[in-house]
From Swiss-Prot:
Keywords (A to Z) from UniProt: ATP-binding, DNA damage, DNA repair, DNA-binding, Nucleotide-binding
InterPro entries: DNA_mismatch_repair_MutS, DNA_mismatch_repair_MutS-lik_N, DNA_mismatch_repair_MutS/MSH, DNA_mismatch_repair_MutS_C, DNA_mismatch_repair_MutS_clamp, DNA_mismatch_repair_MutS_core, DNA_mismatch_repair_MutS_N, DNA_mismatch_repair_MutS_sf
Tagged with keyword NADP: no
One GO BP annotation of this record: mismatch repair
Record family assignment: Belongs to the DNA mismatch repair MutS family.
Binding residues for ATP: 605-612
SUPFAM superfamilies in the cross-refs: DNA repair protein MutS, domain I, DNA repair protein MutS, domain II, DNA repair protein MutS, domain III, P-loop containing nucleoside triphosphate hydrolases
HAMAP family: MutS
One Pfam family, short name: MutS_IV
Coiled-coil segments on the chain, per record: none
Protein's name in the database: DNA mismatch repair protein MutS
Lineage, uppermost ranks: Bacteria, Thermotogati, Thermotogota, Thermotogae, Thermotogales
Length: 823
């Protein structure tokens, strides 16, 4: 943190201020919210920051700038501070100020950071990841991705900073922790992406296996097979221990294995509009009809991590088909899932001793639908296995049911949450506490009868507690055992031994009710912790049931069909773009056929004709197959791709200062270096960022290299009609175009992809449709005619004649290494 603007040396230091400064010294990098009565106060620089961000009044206390937050509104203000990129240390009063001898004891009980939030009020339903990074001796980067709110832990090995940057753009990472020597390498990328970075001392990354064992409660962790990941995992656990002020509780780590999951780079995620982002409509929003927060999070994970294992893909499709073929069952299951709460986060709050009574009621409500779900699934032969994988936790439901009231008001400790009959002692104190008015009324009536003073009344205030009040004119009738405690203009106030004893009982009852109710609640929470593993298994299974039934529901709703998995053939009849079709009145379907032999298409056609939609549609159908969903097509046979690469559109990379063309070439270079024969490559307008001659040359050479060397399935949409000549030299390259109909009123784009080559670009017609002034359109037509008349395009561009093609065919052997440097 920056040096303080305030010098506290000349400040008159009270015991309370000394306590504040001592605690602040331990949390210099955090905003310290210091509990004073009903407020959390910030002082000095923190006060200025809090006042500015929260737009609250800045005041003073003994010349120290001060800004206060009401304790009951803390969560609302906390979110704003954390969203602004600050760590916040919460300092609580650890004893009742009324009972404290001297200065009230205070301690920091929690440090809130963007990546360690577990409080439901501060979270959305999406994952909230923290990334821990550690650079290994061989220059690779070991990464641990953790969601503290769910306990999820993911291990991933990265090759470079660029790979980290790519990953950060596709996953919801709100915080990065790293050693000091790695901070400068990541901080600029993080700032561009709005991610908070905390650099840690080296001891966090010491390979302390005991730290990991304690977090998991295990004697051995050899089966985790952590390798270098143990260091960033250690740092993660220690950091969570520090921020939550308690032992980290995490799930067994999952390795993001590239042999199992397809890697999707951020360019492809953006180009295919897979998840919500700046471009609006996306695949996740179209497919997401899930009924639980857990299912929604899992769906996003599934979309971003398509499977590469054919058996696993077919297993998912098997379950989806079972739901698809039984729509009544699907609707029944989805109805039950509506009653499922965010079980993952409830479990974690239990583990961290931060669960509230409403969490247990939500848990009970969730458990109430498990048996009906199990029974419903068991009626379908294909889904019996899912039913059998749901653990029986009815004993938890009964325990909560027998302990907590279904509906309650107030806070824990007020005696309004635990059922009657759970604790005889609690019941007795609650009776006294909540029926004291009746007792007082009886006492008042008895005293009136005894003294004959009909206007005698019993009341309470914070100064004297309970007292008897008698009007001045009747004071002479006050019994001798009444002790005067206050004289007013029109009355005298008294107390008695009996009234004092009654007051003490009520005060004791209030304290006892609070202690007993909190103790009983903690006991049941501690008991539930013993079921953590089963509860996590239940949460996982309910999430998958939600995703499977969701895929079936969406597939039925949108008329998707089950794809067939093939060895190599890629055949789609009447395929549609799953996102675009949802937002147009009528969508024109198209086919695709590719194989090992026919593996490249050159797609030409005018702007607005639908070229980009078509190639994206092909990519999305492939991806949807590999996430285990039905696809928008009449029929689909799809191979398992190891990667889907895209290069589309023109854009600068503002974060690195790269031009449109350099950005384009970097993306192409990635494709050429990473693609294999099992990849799907989708290219749109490569080479448009430079001169026409250079662009055609690069696009031609690149197409040859992909066809001859990589041999993967490729669709190349381009305005360079010269590239269609490639089909004359290579039997596995075909030309496609998007059909256009010319009418007296103008051009009509039919959006139908057919074999052939575009004979015109129709750029002027598109400009007219876009609304350019008629004078400009007419002038453009005149200029076009002049250019056409005076140009010999074949000579200028050097389109290859039949004889020249023989020379080109010779390049099929290989592409010189030097040529690759162009990319």
């Amino acid at each position: 943190m920056e040096k303080s603007l305030f010098d506290t040396k000349n400040l008159k230091i009270t015991p309370m201020m000394k306590q504040y400064l001592d605690i602040k010294d331990k949390y210099k990098d955090s905003i310290l919210l210091f509990r004073l009565g009903d407020f959390y106060e910030a002082f000095f620089d923190d006060a200025l920051t809090v006042s500015k961000i929260l737009n609250i009044v800045l005041t003073k206390r003994q010349d120290a700038p001060m800004a206060g937050i009401p304790y009951h509104a803390l969560d609302n203000y906390l979110k704003k501070l954390v969203d602004a990129g600050y760590k916040v240390a919460i300092c609580e009063q650890m004893e009742d100020p009324a009972l404290a001898k001297g200065i009230v004891k205070r301690e920091v009980t929690r440090v809130i950071t963007p990546g360690t939030i577990i409080e439901d009020e501060l979270l959305t339903t999406e994952n909230n990841y923290m990334m821990s990074l550690y650079e290994t001796k061989d220059g690779k980067i070991s990464c641990i991705l953790t969601d503290s709110s769910t306990g999820e832990v993911i291990i991933k090995q990265m090759e470079s900073i660029d790979e980290i940057s790519d990953f950060l753009q596709t996953h919801r990472v709100s915080q990065i922790i790293c050693p000091e020597n790695f901070y400068d390498k990541i901080v600029n990328i993080a700032r561009v992406l709005g991610i908070f970075v905390d650099k840690l001392d080296d001891w966090y990354y010491e390979n302390d296996i005991q730290t990991i064992k304690e977090a998991y409660g295990l004697v051995s962790i050899e089966h985790f097979e952590l390798g270098e990941a143990s260091k960033p995992l250690c740092a993660t656990i220690k950091y969570i221990n520090y921020t939550l002020n308690r032992q980290a509780k995490l799930k067994v780590p999952k390795t993001l294995d590239e042999s199992k999951y397809m890697t999707l780079d951020s360019t492809t995620v953006e180009n295919l509009s897979l998840i919500p982002g700046d471009k609006g409509k996306n695949l996740y929003d179209v497919l997401n009809k899930t009924n639980t927060p857990m299912g929604g999070r899992l769906l996003k994970w599934v979309i971003l991590h398509p499977l590469k294992d054919r058996n696993e893909i077919e297993k998912r499709l098997w379950y989806v088909e079972a739901f698809y073929e039984d729509p009544l069952l699907t609707n029944e299951i989805r109805e039950y899932l509506n009653g499922v709460y965010d079980l993952e986060r409830i479990i974690n709050r239990l583990e961290y001793d931060s669960a509230k009574p409403k969490d247990l009621i939500s848990l009970k409500t969730t458990l109430e639908v498990v048996e009906p779900i199990k029974e419903a699934l068991s009626t379908n032969e294909k889904l019996i296995q899912l039913a059998q994988m749901l653990p029986d936790l009815s004993q938890i439901k009964v325990k909560i049911e027998n302990t907590l009231l279904e509906e309650f008001e107030g806070e824990l400790g007020e005696g309004k949450i635990i059922k009657e009959g759970v604790s005889k002692e609690l019941d007795e104190y609650r009776e006294l506490l909540y029926h004291s008015n009746e007792k007082l009324k009886e006492f008042e009536e008895r005293e009136r009868a005894k003294t004959g003073i009909q206007k005698l009344k019993v009341s309470f205030n914070n100064v004297f507690g309970y007292y008897i009040e008698i009007p001045k004119g009747q004071v002479k009738f006050a019994p001798q055992e009444y002790t005067r405690i206050q004289t007013l203009v029109n009355a005298e106030r008294y107390t008695t031994t009996e009234l004092k004893e009654f007051e003490q009982k009520i005060l004791a009852a209030k304290e006892k009710v609070e202690i007993l109710e909190k103790t009983i609640f903690k006991q049941i929470c501690d008991e539930l912790k013993g079921y953590t593993q089963d509860l996590r298994k239940l949460a996982e299974m309910l999430s998958w049931i939600d995703v499977y039934s969701n895929f079936a529901y969406v597939s039925k709703l949108y008329s998707y069909s089950k794809p067939e998995i093939s060895d190599s053939e890629f055949k789609v009849l009447n395929g549609r773009h799953p996102v675009v079709e949802r937002f147009v009145d009528e969508f024109v379907p198209n086919d695709i056929y590719m194989s090992d032999e026919l593996r490249m298409y050159i797609l030409t056609g005018p702007n607005m004709s639908g070229k980009s939609t078509y190639i994206r549609q092909v990519g999305l159908i492939a991806l949807m197959t590999q996430i285990g969903c039905f696809v928008p097509a009449q029929y689909a046979k799809v191979p398992v791709f190891d990667r889907i690469f895209t290069r589309m559109g023109a854009r600068d990379d503002i974060s690195t200062g790269k031009s449109t063309f350099l950005t384009e070439m970097n993306e192409v270079a990635l494709i050429l270096s990473k693609a294999t024969q099992k990849s799907l490559v989708l290219l749109d307008e490569v080479g448009r960022g430079t001169s026409t001659f250079d662009g055609i040359s690069i696009a031609w050479a690149m197409s040859e290299y992909i066809y001859n060397e990589i041999k993967c399935k490729t669709i190349f949409a381009t305005h360079f009609t010269e590239l269609t000549e490639l089909s004359e030299g290579y039997s596995g390259i075909k030309n496609l175009t998007v059909d256009v109909k010319e009418t007296p009123d103008g051009v009509v784009f039919l959006h139908k992809v057919v074999e052939g080559v575009a004979d015109r670009s129709y750029g002027i017609e598109v400009a007219a449709i876009a609304g350019l002034p008629e004078s400009i359109i007419e002038r453009a037509k005149e200029i076009l005619n002049i250019i056409v008349e005076k140009s010999d395009l074949e000579k200028k561009v050097g389109v290859l004649k039949e004889g020249q093609m023989k020379k080109i065919k010779a390049t099929k052997k290989s592409v010189p290494e030097g040529q690759m440097k162009l990319f």
